[in-house]
Amino acid sequence: MKFPKRYAIVLLTFMCTNVCYIERVGFSIAYTVAADAVGTNQANKGMILSMFYYGYVLSQIPGGWAAQRLGGRLVLLLSFVLWSSICAVVPLDPNRVILLVLSRLLVGVAQGLIFPSIHTVLAQWVPPQERSRSVSLTTSGMYLGAACGMLLLPSLVKNMGPQSVFSVEAMLGVAWLLIWFKFASDPPRTDLPKVASKDKMKVQTGGIMAPRTVKIPWARILFSLPIWAIVVNNFTFHYALYVLMNWLPTYFKLGLQLSLQDMGFSKMLPYLNMFLFSNIGGVLADHLITRKILSVTKTRKLLNTVGFVVSAIALMALPLFRTPSGAIFCSSVSLGFLALGRAGFAVNHMDVAPKFAGIVMGISNTAGTLAGIVGVGLTGRILEAAKASNMDLTSSESWRTVFFVPGYLCIFSSFIFLIFSTGEKIFE
């Protein structure tokens, strides 16, 4: 039996997000070690860690536009060429602040093109009844990549130094772009001359036949309440994710006096849980929809609400647990249920605007990236303020605000999605 092309595309996009998150987690691990070795303070660490997101936010909407016009395949190739080259040539020296700032900005710009392009590709290739699990599988690559990075890269840093992480990331990026170049292709075009070809394309693309020159309804998109429900939840999801991804190593080291190198397999559990729950959410959503157990709207709202509310509870419990096992448990539950919630808001843009999925994803991910800028930088300042107030960073009080802020945001965002979201197509 021939392997359907759309399955190959989904598998390749899964590998894409996997490699990208190995890079992101790898930088936070390697830079934290290098910065601590030279005595960099927490505010400056937060500034460098957040630079990626300043670049990332600049290319979200242009990335969606470029994918719509040029095709997601080409834009993904260009992205990987740029960020892999930077990883290959830039030295990881915390004292060379300007070079680090510029390099992280450029890596952010390059990777900001990725998710709008991926969602454009998936909206074109994947039929509606397979979208939840396809998007969930693709995005679960992020979490598996983060899990692999947390498991393997601390040992690499310990044995070969922080710079070795950059080299490995560059090699992984080049390997993926070569595979993508060879096996990926743009979807069938809409300008095929025969009706039979058009009918075939409808089956392959789920009826999404908008040509690349279609007029984009910018005003309607920007003033749509269901779109804003997606945007708000994307912001909150990424605020919580990026705070944990960038500051969890510091929390283990300073808050719990525990080295990542000594944690073994347990340090990858939060991200492995995200991988599992993301796919569970996608399969469950498709099951509820295809079996007509719930409508698309009710399915999205149910999974989004359960995911965000449970995550909020676990986030606010995190600083109260003063043992490594308690912290791992809370962070695993929080991130796992956040990933489950992606079967709500993160697929919803393909429900409401399938022809403009890349554009809506670009807008939504812009908000998510702003969350990275705000959350990662703000956390560094919160910790510095705690130190200035003579609070001990080993105490739970100094970390309470760090984890309570995303917890409250999760509760607020779940209500916004319940009130304003829909699973119906609103943009033809």
Curated annotation (Swiss-Prot):
Disulfide pairings: none
UniProt-annotated location(s): Cell membrane
Highest taxon above the source species: Eukaryota
Transmembrane segments: 47-67, 74-94, 98-118, 137-157, 164-184, 221-241, 269-289, 301-321, 327-347, 356-376, 401-421
Membrane topology: Multi-pass membrane protein
Coiled coil: none
Gene Ontology annotations for the cellular component aspect, listed alphabetically: plasma membrane
Main location: membrane
Keyword set, alphabetical order: Cell membrane, Ion transport, Membrane, Signal, Transmembrane, Transmembrane helix, Transport
UniProt GO molecular function: phosphate transmembrane transporter activity
InterPro entries, alphabetized: MFS, MFS_dom, MFS_Na/Anion_cotransporter, MFS_trans_sf, SLC17A9-like
One GO term (biological process): monoatomic ion transport
Endpoints of the signal sequence: 1-22
Function according to Swiss-Prot or TrEMBL: Probable anion transporter.
Family (UniProt): Belongs to the major facilitator superfamily. Sodium/anion cotransporter (TC 2.A.1.14) family.
Protein name (database record): Probable anion transporter 6
